[in-house]
Structures are given as C-alpha cells and as structure tokens.
Amino acid sequence: MKHIRNFSIIAHIDHGKSTLSDRLIQECGGLSDREMAAQVLDSMDLERERGITIKAQSVTLDYKAKDGETYQLNFIDTPGHVDFSYEVSRSLAACEGALLVVDAGQGVEAQTLANCYTALDMDLDVVPVLNKIDLPQADPERVAEEIEDIVGIEAADAVRCSAKTGLGISDVLETIVAQIPPPEGDPEAPLQALIIDSWFDSYLGVVSLVRIKHGVLKKGDKFKVMSTGQTHTADRVGIFTPKQTDTAQLSTGEVGFVIAGIKEIHGAPVGDTLTLAKNGADKPLPGFKKVKPQVYAGVFPISTDDYENFRDALNKLSLNDASLFFEPETSSALGFGFRIGYLGLLHMEIIQERLEREYNLDLITTAPTVVYEVVTTKGETIYVDNPSDLPPMNNIEEMREPIVETNILVPKEYLGNVITLCIEKRGVQTNMVYHGNQVAITYDMPMAEVVMDFFDRLKSTSRGYASLEYNFKRFEAADMVRLDVLINGDRVDALAMILHKANVRYQGLALVNKMKELIPRQMFDIAIQAAVGSQIIARSSVKALRKDVTAKCYGGDVSRKKKLLQKQKEGKKRMKQVGNVEVPQEAFLAVLKINE
C-alpha cells in the first residue's frame, strides 16, 4: 500500500492538464506510441471538438522511481470550467494529493484558486507545477511569486516542466512520489468503496469507478449498494491503463472499475458506498454534497414521438452526470417535455449537444431562468424556477433573486472595462486587492445576470485575460417582474421570462422586434406584444401579405375598386379570427440572444 499514490490534476481552463496527463501516460508506458493520441483522456467527440475536458477520467500507471521501487500512480484528469467544478470536487474526494498546474505565461487565474481551495478544504497536499516553460513569454519566477502571494502555498521549488515538449516530466513524477502521501486504510477491515463516477454501457450495464477506502473487492464477490441495499455480483473488476484492463481484485487505496451487470440505471448512484453482502461495513462513507442546479430551462422534443426516447436519454445521462436534475413539464406551445436544471450555461449547451448527438434527438430549449424566492401575500415562501409558475403580481408580497459572490482576477490594464461591465450587470463591489500585475475583485451580483452572458462579455472586454469563479451567497429582495409575450392576444407560455424592472422596457422592445423578423408573414396582420401584468409595454406587427385586388380594374367607377378592397378587408378580418400563428423554433431561441 505504501507504493500507491492517488492524485488529481487541477488547473484553470487551458493551462495544460490534459496534455500533462498524456505525457505522464507516455512516460510510464501506459500506451504504445501507436495508440497515443493528443488528449487521450478526452474521449467524448464533444470534448475533442471544443478542446475542453467535461468528464473526469481516471488512469492507473506503474512508475519505476529512481529509488528502484515501482509505484502505482492512480490519477484523475479533471475539467477546468466553473460549470464542472463538482466533477473536480468528486475527483478530489478519491485522492490524497493534487497537482496544481499553472501556466508559466498566464499566471494564476480564478479557477486555479477555486480548485486549489477545494483541495485544501479536503486536506489534500497540493503540489504546484509550472507548465509551458518552453514558451518565450514564460516567466516562472514571477508566477511562483504569484502562487505564493495569491494562493498562499509554498512554490519556490515548484516543479517546472513543459507538457508539450516533455521537458521535466520525470521531475514531476519524482515529486509526486516524494510529496504526495500514500493512502491510509485498513486492508483487514470490512469493504468500503466510494463510487466516484458511473456510466451506462449498453452491453455491460452500469460501469462504476470506485476508490477502495478499506478492505478488498475481489472478482466474483457479492457486494451491496448501501443506499438501496441491493446486492450484486462483481462480474469484472479492473483498472484503466487508459485501456480497460481486468484484474483479480482491487485492494485498499486503489482506484478501479466494477461491472456487476446492473441493468436499472440508478442502481449505483455516484457518491454511494459499496460493501460486501456478508459481514459488510455498518456505516457508509461520507458522500458528496449534492450540487444544486443554478439555471433551469424547459427542453422539448420537436416531434412528440421522441418523448419516450428523450426520457430514457435523460435517465442515462443523469447517471453519468450527477448534477443533472429534471422533471416533466407541459407547454401549450411546445407540448410535452422536461424542465432541466443545469449548473450554468456551458453545462446547458453541453447537455443539449450530448442529447442531440449521442441519442439522435431534435430539441428546442426555452430561455433559461434561475430560482427565485417568492413571498406571497398569505405569508408563504415558494421557490419558482419557471416563469409560468409565478403567482399573479398582486399576490406577491416580495420577490427575492439569488445573489452570487463572483471573484474576478484581471490584469491591471483591463480593470476599468471589467468594473464598467460589473456595474452594468447590477453588481456591488465588496473587495479589491492588488497582487503584482493582477487585481482580484469581488462583486455581489444577481445570478441571473451572471449566467446569461457575463462570462463571454467578461472575456471580450478583457481580451480573454480576466477569469471568473462564482458561488451562491444569498437571496435578496429585488424588483422583478414577469414579461409575457402575446401573439395576436394569446400568451405564449414558452416565451415568458422574469426580468428586473429597470431592464424590462428595453428587453421587451428588443424581443418584439427580434420576433417580428422571425415570424413568417401570414395573410393577416400579426400583433406581437410584450406585457407586464395587464400593461402592454412594447408592440410590433408583422404586416399581412396582400393580393392586389384592384389590378384588374381599368378605368371605370371608383366604387368598383372600393367594393373589391372592402371585400378583401372583410376576408382578412374573418381569417384573423380563425387563423392561428405557428411560432418557428428560431423565435424561441431569439429570447436567448436578445442582448446581441
């Protein structure tokens, strides 16, 4: 056991986590040169296209150290985006240490800090690594100072390496062996294994990635899942060397997979504990805290026949993605679908793309909303995540919106732009500290403003240098109203949104003008109105197509023309009473893109 090292790789987006893991695999001979590909561990097509890591992946390598001993390294490559931070905290729960990778050119960024604090909260040993030292703009001395100054961990003798060229990789491995402690645990005790991750394989059933805390799990053992009490037989156990490799047993301190032919999808939830069916452990391991979704959106299949497939797809995805929350929803405009809770807008995009790709579905998404706390006049407190569930305005005593604490790290020269942006987003500054060339600013900001497009705008005002991480702080009373869209006097429930009173006129106008371009012209006028309660605040109309009925009149009496025009007018009026307007899919997406 003293030859096992479990660690995660944490870093900000694009500081080279996945490339570093490639080099570690190559150095330890996990894969032959022929099988090696860039970013081996980003196995999803989507991850490769976007160049980001979405799922944490685990690998077991054997490393022969300079002291002549062979060490087993279990490491987990984690995502860097703030939307996937729960993936990071899950991976850290399975480790004794973490490699904090920092780009020697960019320096410390917000996500570096957030992930590092998560690791320190869990009492892990954090080993700083300066990556990309082959770049001409790399300045390892300055960055090492920054790490000590901002993060507060010893970094004078931080390992320097370049994952791209492979320089200094052996030093990284030696440091891991020297500085990260071996796992603690009792091989003789009853089995306790923590499920770090599970996914559904259509041939094997549920595959679970586990970390053995105490005891041993052998192939063929009968084990039970502690939350459900169901027993299963371990058909196969093994490790990833990135390839799936079967072994006879997983012993204390190891990280590996278990396949037990579990067919029902929620048979082995993430964060659960496995123990042996006979004389097992009495109490489960502390799991992970449940992450609460921050953003909700309605998602509907375009053809109603897909509803069943859509439900199965969501079930399979939620096994793999523990933070996904969904419940059925119906809309008069879009039919049957689900209300899905996400961790942020990137998460929302990724989930929608995965559903469309991996399960061949065509989906429409409504505008995302955050959760509001509403106090009714009867004194009840309710939580609303769907604009159509909002009680009428005269029954609401007060509405409170979620406020998040955002920590932004930005180079001095872009500070002005960033502050202007934060004020525009109704932010209140609570703190500001200078660290060398960087400034750390803290704002309290409405979550609704942060999740919409704050991240993209922050990146563009600071040329990509500013970085951000945020967490929920409290609910605060605010002047929020519901904006409804009426088409020919009918409310379209899927287009409603909850906005701040100050923005509502501007947003309403922008929305009706955008809709006007997207709704196809009919044979009658279509009135598009934006309303707050019973008050109409903006209107635009899609003009009718009309036939030139007087073209055939040549000369003659004017009353003849009048008669034809009058007849056309009556026809249009009749059509307007019976005609209904199809709202095209682009119009629903217009709500998301008002601000552009």
UniProtKB/Swiss-Prot annotation:
Membrane topology of the entry? Peripheral membrane protein
What GO annotations for molecular function exist for this entry? GTP binding; GTPase activity; guanosine tetraphosphate binding; ribosome binding; translation elongation factor activity
A GO biological process of this protein is: positive regulation of translation
Q: Which Pfam families match?
A: EFG_C, GTP_EFTU, GTP_EFTU_D2, LepA_C
Which reactions appear under catalytic activity for this entry?
A: GTP + H2O = GDP + phosphate + H(+)
| Domain tr-type G, first and last residues per copy | 2-184
Q: Which CDD domains match?
A: EF4_II, EF4_III, LepA, lepA_C
**Which InterPro entries does its entry note?**
EF-4 (IPR006297), EFG_III/V (IPR035647), EFG_V-like (IPR000640), EFTu-like_2 (IPR004161), G_TR_CS (IPR031157), LepA_C_sf (IPR038363), LepA_CTD (IPR013842), LepA_IV (IPR035654)
Tell me the domain of life: Bacteria
Annotated compartments: Cell inner membrane
Q: What is its EC number?
A: 3.6.5.n1
Q: Which UniProt keywords apply?
A: Cell inner membrane, Cell membrane, GTP-binding, Hydrolase, Membrane, Nucleotide-binding, Protein biosynthesis
Q: Which Gene3D superfamilies match?
A: 3.30.70.240, Elongation factor 4, C-terminal domain, Elongation Factor G (Translational Gtpase), domain 3, P-loop containing nucleotide triphosphate hydrolases, Translation factors
HAMAP family attached to this UniProt entry: LepA
Give the matching NCBIfam families: lepA (TIGR01393), small_GTP (TIGR00231)
Instruction: Return the similarity comment.
Output: Belongs to the TRAFAC class translation factor GTPase superfamily. Classic translation factor GTPase family. LepA subfamily.
The role this protein plays is: Required for accurate and efficient protein synthesis under certain stress conditions. May act as a fidelity factor of the translation reaction, by catalyzing a one-codon backward translocation of tRNAs on improperly translocated ribosomes. Back-translocation proceeds from a post-translocation (POST) complex to a pre-translocation (PRE) complex, thus giving elongation factor G a second chance to translocate the tRNAs correctly. Binds to ribosomes in a GTP-dependent manner.
The protein, known as: Elongation factor 4
